[in-house]
Structure formats: C-alpha cells, structure tokens
UniProtKB/Swiss-Prot annotation:
Protein name (Swiss-Prot/TrEMBL): ATP-dependent 6-phosphofructokinase
Transmembrane segments: none
Gene behind the chain: pfk
Places the protein is found: Glycosome
InterPro entries in alphabetical order: ATP_PFK (IPR022953), PFKA (IPR050929), Phosphofructokinase_dom (IPR000023), PKF_sf (IPR035966), PyroP-dep_PFK_TP0108 (IPR012004)
Active site: 229
Keyword Disulfide bond: no
Protein species of origin: Trypanosoma brucei brucei
Amino acid sequence: MAVESRSRVTSKLVKAHRAMLNSVTQEDLKVDRLPGADYPNPSKKYSSRTEFRDKTDYIMYNPRPRDEPSSENPVSVSPLLCELAAARSRIHFNPTETTIGIVTCGGICPGLNDVIRSITLTGINVYNVKRVIGFRFGYWGLSKKGSQTAIELHRGRVTNIHHYGGTILGSSRGPQDPKEMVDTLERLGVNILFTVGGDGTQRGALVISQEAKRRGVDISVFGVPKTIDNDLSFSHRTFGFQTAVEKAVQAIRAAYAEAVSANYGVGVVKLMGRDSGFIAAQAAVASAQANICLVPENPISEQEVMSLLERRFCHSRSCVIIVAEGFGQDWGRGSGGYDASGNKKLIDIGVILTEKVKAFLKANKSRYPDSTVKYIDPSYMIRACPPSANDALFCATLATLAVHEAMAGATGCIIAMRHNNYILVPIKVATSVRRVLDLRGQLWRQVREITVDLGSDVRLARKLEIRRELEAINRNRDRLHEELAKL
C-alpha cells in the first residue's frame, strides 16, 4: 500500500528489530556443539571432496561494505559473522548406534512432510542410523502418555508423503513438561531430536536442550524453523513461504476477476501475516493486480483506507484490497487472551474490513451505484497444500543439512538461509525478535509504486493517462493513413 504516512515508517516493530541486532554480539552467534568428533563420516566415497568440511566457515551477516568500493580492504557495515552449515568429515555420533526423533508442532505449512521425509531418508541412506522415530501431535507426543503413540519412520512409510500437505506426524500447540520429554528421549534412546515448528516450538526446543545438558545426557536438539509468514530473524526465507505467495496470487486474481466484472466492484483478500506482511507485500507485487495493501507494519486508520478506496474509484471502477491478518487489530474488539502457542488471539480483520467497505459504499450509493464487495480468505487452503517444486527443494536442503550438522554434534540451534547461504543460528538469538517488513526497503517501495497513494494528484495522473492514450490513438491513426495512401 502506498499511503503517504511517513510518521509511521519507523514503527515500534522496526525499531525493536534494529535495537535487538545492535545488542547481538559474536558470542551470541556461537553454536553449541557436543564435545568430541570421534567418528568418520560414513560417506567415504566423497570424503576427499570439498562438500565435507573439517573446519568452521563463516559468512558476513551483512555483505555491504562500510568503506568506498575503492578501498583496498573493505569492511562490512556489521561485525557479525554467521556460521555456515555443512556436512562434516568427522562426526559426533556413531551412526549405527544413533536414534533420530522428529516432532512437528504448531500450525501446518506446505513442506512439513518434505522435511520429515528428507530427515528420515538422509538418516537412513547416508548415515545408516539405527532408528528414526516420529513423535505424534507435537510436544504432546514426547510426554509420558503421548510417547506411546510414537511411530517408526522408514523408507516405505515416508517415500510418497511429500505429495501431500499437512504432516503425517500430526501437530499440536502448547508446551509440555521438559523433564518428562527428556525422560522420553532417554527411555527410547533418542540421540538427536529434530523440532520442526515456529518460534514457540524452538523456544521449547531450547528448554529441552538445556534440560538434557543439565542432566549430562548426550542428546542434540536441532530446530528446523517453520513460519509461513517468513518472519524468522537472521533468515531471508522459510519453507512454505514461496508456496504461500503463489497460492495467494491465485486468490488475488480471483478477487480481481470479481471486481472488474462489476460496476464499482471491490475484492478483499485476507492473507496470513500475524506480525509481518511479507506474504501480502510479495503477493501484491507478483500479482500486479492489487490496489491497496494493508500490513501490520504500516498501521493506518479506517478513514484512511476509505480515502484510498475513494482515490482508486476516481480513475477506475474496480479495486482489489489485500489485508494481512495482523493488520488493524485496533479496529474492533476481539475475544482477548492467547492461544495454546502463546500468540495473542486476533480479530478477524478480513470480515471487519469487508463490512466497513460495504457500509462505506452503501453510505455513498449515489456515487457508487450497483457496487459489490467479494471477500476471499484462502488461508487454510494455502497452508494445507503441498509445496511448490522450489519449496520442496528448499525443504530437502534444510533437512539434509540439519541431519549433517546434528550428526556432527550441533545442538540448541536452527538451520536458516541468509544471502543464499545456509547458516546455523542459536535458538536463543533466532527467537528473540520477529523479522518485519522494512518500510524503507525495496519490497515496500515496489508495493508503493503499484498501489494507490494518498499523496499523489489523482486528477493529474488521470489527465496524463488520458493524454498517453490519445497520443497512442494518434500514432495509430497516422499509421493507418499511411497504409491507406499506399493502396
């Protein structure tokens, strides 16, 4: 959305994000590893190749140089380094005596089954591990009662699961007693636990890791982050996000078809984005059919939204509005409270916005006769679908690198992608703050350029548009006269 609201650009969310990064030290980014790497990687046929690392490599957190390009030794604007993920030539766990556990938590997301499949097959095919266990229905599956439902994961069970959405392990929200969960891991002989879930899940993973460390048991707890909103700090992409954008574009195109097929038609599409508007912003740019884009990072009033709608109707009889679910939480009164994951319950801004648009059009019926408003909420269809091919590849890469690093003893960390490199980030740092849209960044600039702007002169813009159309007609008329003269 291209609303001219400069005072809102430096929102509290953006400030908090930058302040947090300023307080992070290199020591905070140091990845914990279980002591000892006594076993050679069993993939001996590749042992002499560079895919297997003996030492830790790093990338700069921010590749932008502080100095001018002419500087002989440019220095990054940030002193922070992130540890690169890799397969290791020597590993911590004895593969044939290693048991892997997998748990999926929180809401479902495209790619969950791909991650489960890749972890399982990497453990079996590459490392020949003793067992792979799947814990059912989130952290409940690690409780004393829930552990009775654990299932064995093998090639036959996971071969085709990537064709389907959801998770074959099931999922749930909410914490469990960490002591009870570590008891389960010890009882079943689990050496590595992969936790696939959002920030709440990973905070729970950190507690499990700390309890295991307190007991002195040799267990790696390794996170594969799942956030369809793409709001993970230190990461530029999370699995399922690209698929969500693709499906969101389909919903926007449907809303556009409804809007342009009516006299003063409005299509409203609610997309996922509790605290971050990445899906809404990218879908707006990708579809090139959105006229207003509302995201949590740029809060505006009901009056301003209706002014944007008026501005759009000054030069078109259709309007498509995209709204992220976390936008406009001060527009109405919700039920209050928090869900089992600790997230604040949101009001349904999609329904509220739709009703307010209808009321506005009804109050201005003489100006906008025969107006219609169509509302589309594709959220559950998006998160339940299988991933796109590119997302499936991304899931496989995250999962296989997670197995390689966990086998080498990395623990209390997550796998993430930054600047097209795969890195390890300690869970404590990764979950300390959400990543949000930079309202001064390139993505938001693109959104502003293609959507309605209260700061622009609509009459002048319409006049220029008509003038361009007339010039095109005149050029075509001259061409036709020339062709006619030749006959």
